[in-house]
Regions:
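Phosphate-binding beta-alpha-beta segment of Rossmann-like dinucleotide-binding domains, i.e.
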Residues: 90, 98-152
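Short beta->alpha connector loops at strand-helix junctions that form conserved
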Residues: 34, 75-76, 92-103, 180
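Rossmann-fold NAD(P)-binding glycine/threonine-rich loop
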Residues: 80-92
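N-terminal glycine-/charge-rich "phosphate-binding" loop or analogous flexible N-terminal tail
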Residues: 1-48
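Rossmann-like dinucleotide/phosphate-binding beta-alpha-beta segment
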Residues: 139-182
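A short, aliphatic-rich alpha-helical micro-motif
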Residues: 44-45, 63-66, 148
């Protein structure tokens, strides 16, 4: 059986330099491009059986010129960068990484909430500038902290990420609710 030719059009989006791509190389002939400009998509993918993309947009005009293409893998949770209807017309399945990053995104939401409540960045800058040590009593409350307990917070969307945000915030004693269109 012929090993597939796999092309990753924008590998920099997943690899800050710490991946060797071995697991993909084991599957077939693999080429990873850091970035691919729109005008280079066809030339870089002409022999591809499989394209992996994260942000590089693929449309009908590409599928028309890539007769060997058998699969598109989106290295993200969504696949809005792909003209899925056109891919379907050409018999090209599109898959994504559903559930990828749920914990990391929820953690970032909580980090931003804690920044709003505690102003960590503000106090870090104040410490670096010497503000704290210049106070007569070596105490600085130039911005009050917000305690999260008993504060109300609504989460818009109750999918995987919304549920995880609520799970992470429960220990703070907040009054949490979710709003969803479903």
């Amino acid at each position: 059986m012929k090993r597939p030719h796999i092309v990753f059009l924008d590998a920099h989006t997943l690899n800050p330099g710490d991946l060797d791509w071995k697991c993909i190389k084991d599957l077939g002939e693999f080429t990873a491009y850091e970035r691919t400009e729109r005008e280079n998509i066809i030339s870089r993918s002409i022999e591809a059986d499989i394209i992996i993309t994260n942000k590089t947009v693929l449309r009908r005009e590409h599928f028309e010129k890539l007769p060997k293409l058998r699969l598109i893998c989106v290295a993200a949770t969504g696949f809005d960068v792909i003209d899925v209807a056109a891919a379907r017309e050409f018999g090209i399945p599109v898959c994504n990484c559903a559930g990828y990053g749920t914990r990391a995104v929820a953690q970032m939401v909580v980090a931003h909430l804690l920044e709003v409540a505690n102003r960590v960045g503000h106090y870090t800058a104040a410490c670096h500038s010497g503000f704290w040590s210049q106070q007569n009593d070596f105490c600085s409350w130039n911005n009050p902290l917000m305690e999260l307990q008993d504060k109300k917070m609504g989460v818009i969307g109750f999918g995987n990420i919304g549920r995880e945000v609520i799970n992470l915030l429960r220990p703070f004693g907040m009054l949490l609710f979710a709003v969803t269109s479903k």
